[in-house]
Amino acid sequence: MSDKNGEECWYALKVFYNRVFELEKQLSQEGVRSYIPLLHEDTVAGDKKIRKRKPAVSSLMFIRQSEHYLLELQDRMKASCPFMAYFDRETKKPAVIPDREMELFMQITSADTSDLEYFSDEAIDYRSGDKVRVTGGPFKGAEGYIKRIRGNRRLVVALEGIIAVATTYILSLIHI
């Protein structure tokens, strides 16, 4: 999948100094779709319960835009909010994330659960397990691989070359 004729695609970014929320705000003002895998931390201040957003993976965010816009934004933001796009080693261009992979990743990482574990793409051989589709629960419809991690069977969904996320074990599965 390439970015021909200004086609919008998903790209992964490493935002320096963990300024993901600053970049998210800027992108929102420009009408650009972005996604940050988040954790929600509940804290108590006095008698108020406060829920804070925190990046699940430091400095990682995704945007959906054209390659031209991405490169122009990178140049424009280098002084105030520097970031780099993950590059495809073969094409030497920003790595395009297929829409289906990104949808599955967002489905898993946006579930309101603290039982997710993130890995660099090289840290786990996620393709060695059985490919499955979840048929019930909060991850219904998600596809990934079953992998044994620290003795437990887990569902792993990966964005190749970027990151992998493992859920708790899911009982309702269909082998693909």
Where are these regions (language model features)?
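Short beta-strand-centered aromatic/proline hotspots
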Residues: 141-148
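Conserved small/polar residues in nucleotide/adenosyl-binding loops
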Residues: 175-176
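Short, conserved beta-turn/loop elements at beta-strand boundaries and strand-helix junctions
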Residues: 149-154
